[in-house]
Swiss-Prot record:
Belongs to the mitochondrion-specific ribosomal protein mL40 family. This is Large ribosomal subunit protein mL40. It comes from the Eukaryota. Component of the mitochondrial ribosome large subunit (39S) which comprises a 16S rRNA and about 50 distinct proteins. Pfam families: MRP-L28. PANTHER family: 39S RIBOSOMAL PROTEIN L40, MITOCHONDRIAL, LARGE RIBOSOMAL SUBUNIT PROTEIN ML40. GO terms for biological process: mitochondrial translation. It comes from Mus musculus (Mouse). Keywords: Mitochondrion, Ribonucleoprotein, Ribosomal protein, Transit peptide. It is found in: Mitochondrion. Residues 170-189 are annotated as: Disordered. The gene is Mrpl40. Residues 1-46 form a transit peptide. GO terms for cellular component: mitochondrial inner membrane; mitochondrial large ribosomal subunit; mitochondrial ribosome; mitochondrion; nucleolus. Ubiquitous.
Length: 206
């Protein structure tokens, strides 16, 4: 009798939309359904199947470790050969002392003549440098005077005159040549022998 009364009270208190067997599901999924626009996924959809553990043979594992230790010892004993830099190595034929040019001893008159010639050459180059410097200074002064006169005549022409000339850079120059070029010269396409040395380093395989 008491049990029937309790069941009737429970049926009266529960909501009409309540379906048997869904109460537990609502309680369990409330933390997942925060938004109605969100994707309603369940916990099993975010999970992945358990991976099967591989059985490792202790003997194979120990054999692999031994092979690795043996390879390391082999590398420590025989270090790799460094590739030589041929540009920094002087050929043996150039180290022969018999090919050295003996030092010439000049007479006092010849030494004096060379010293005077060097002084005259230094004086000539100094005068040439001063002449070039004076010519550049006079050209700059004339250019500045012409710009000032142009500025008084027309501001637009002055603005165009002081603009940077983009055709000056990059600067390309050819010559002077030691010999005059030969017109209609075709360079011969001959054969050549490649004597570049190729070095191979031994790699130890696992």
């Amino acid at each position: 009798m008491a049990t029937g009364v309790m069941l009737c009270a429970a049926r009266a208190l529960r909501p009409r939309s309540w379906i048997p067997g869904t109460c537990q599901a609502h309680v369990r999924h409330t933390h997942q359904r925060a938004s109605l626009l969100a994707f309603w996924d369940l916990i099993p959809m975010r999970a992945e199947p358990l991976r099967k553990k591989k059985k490792v043979d202790p003997r194979k594992d120990q054999a692999a470790k031994d092979r690795l230790k043996k390879r390391i010892r082999k590398l420590e004993k025989a270090s790799q050969e460094l590739i030589p830099i041929e540009d920094f190595i002087t050929p043996v034929r150039f180290l022969d002392k018999s090919r050295q040019r003996p030092q010439e001893e000049h007479s006092p008159e010849e030494s004096e003549r060379r010293a005077l010639l060097l002084k005259r050459w230094a004086l000539f180059k100094q005068q040439e440098h001063e002449m070039e410097r004076d010519a550049i200074r006079s050209m700059l002064e004339a250019q500045q005077e012409a710009l000032e006169e142009l500025k008084l005549e027309s501001a637009e022409l002055y603005a165009e005159a002081i603009k940077r000339d983009t055709s000056l850079f990059p600067f390309e120059k050819e010559g002077p040549h030691y010999t005059p070029p030969i017109s209609n010269y075709q360079a011969p396409e001959g054969r050549y022998n490649d004597i570049t040395k190729v070095y191979t380093q031994v790699e130890f395989k696992r």
